[in-house]
């Protein structure tokens, strides 16, 4: 593996790396926006910060589809680049656009099954917007959208207990026939969806990319099945 440094908002810094690529993967995103973090850290008043964090819409960058060749993505909000619209949506659309220019056979995007509790709905809405735009605008490139719930890994210690709690909620919801998630509506979000280890999602992504018939969204159950399929291949 070779590591390269690039700026996701500046396509010119990574476009040369896409030449001849078999696959391109977008795995970057933000869970909390800068203004939301400001409220939690006390740097901004709860009223002003939360009103902006939970606004129905924000601007991302200029339209990534009509930007000039090599033009950087320019944040349109005073919050800077840390909005769902820019980091979760526009950066993915731009990377897909650059990959399509290089006739990359397949593109994978790590999306999400739902927004976690207390996270603005725009978190998952912008991911769905990225999925639909990439599918519509780049039909000649096989695009895959993995939709995991909460992802965890031992390298990020704080995610392990959160995954355990989410796992319990998932089992309770399953045992109740989905009543828990249904009663609380969209509030529970990914808290009632089985958490997945990051390695499982990565294994599934590789397996999906290697299957030329595979395209479109892949939900949690299928992610697990693909990961197991890849694991079994590795054992042969």
Features from the language model and the residues they span:
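Extracellular-facing segments of soluble proteins and assemblies that are Gly/Ser/Thr-biased and enriched
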Residues: 89-113
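Residue-level signature of transmembrane alpha-helix interfaces in integral membrane proteins
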Residues: 36-38, 45, 104, 163, ...
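Catalytic loop of short-chain dehydrogenase/reductase
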Residues: 66-85, 108-128, 135
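Oxidoreductase cofactor-interface core, primarily capturing Rossmann-like NAD(P)-dependent enzymes
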Residues: 101-102, 115-236
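NAD(P)H-binding glycine-rich loop region in Rossmannoid oxidoreductase-like domains
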Residues: 1-94, 98
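Short coil/turn segments at beta-strand junctions that form active-site/ligand-binding loops
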Residues: 20-22, 105, 141
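SDR active-site strand-loop-helix element
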Residues: 27, 107-113, 146-148
């Amino acid at each position: 593996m070779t590591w390269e440094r690039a700026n996701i908002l500046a396509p010119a810094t990574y476009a040369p790396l896409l030449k001849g690529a078999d696959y391109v993967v977008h795995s970057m995103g933000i869970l909390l926006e800068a203004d939301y973090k400001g409220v939690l850290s006390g740097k901004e008043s709860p009223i002003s910060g939360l009103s902006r964090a939970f606004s129905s819409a924000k601007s991302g960058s200029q339209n990534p589809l009509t930007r000039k060749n090599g033009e950087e993505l320019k944040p349109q909000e005073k919050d800077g680049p840390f909005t769902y619209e820019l980091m979760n949506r526009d950066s993915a659309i731009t990377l897909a656009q650059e990959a399509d220019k290089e006739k990359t056979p397949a593109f994978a995007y790590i999306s999400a099954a739902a927004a976690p509790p207390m996270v603005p709905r725009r978190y998952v809405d912008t991911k769905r917007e990225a999925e639909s735009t990439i599918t519509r605008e780049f039909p000649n490139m096989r695009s895959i959208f993995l939709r995991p719930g909460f992802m965890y890994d031992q390298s990020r210690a704080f995610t392990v207990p959160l995954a355990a709690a989410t796992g319990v909620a998932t089992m309770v919801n399953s045992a109740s026939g989905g009543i828990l998630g249904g009663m609380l509506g969209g509030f529970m979000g990914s808290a009632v969806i089985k958490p997945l280890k990051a390695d499982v999602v990565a294994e599934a992504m590789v397996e999906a990319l290697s299957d030329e018939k595979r395209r479109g969204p892949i939900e949690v159950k299928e992610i697990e099945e693909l990961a197991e399929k890849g694991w079994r291949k590795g054992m042969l």
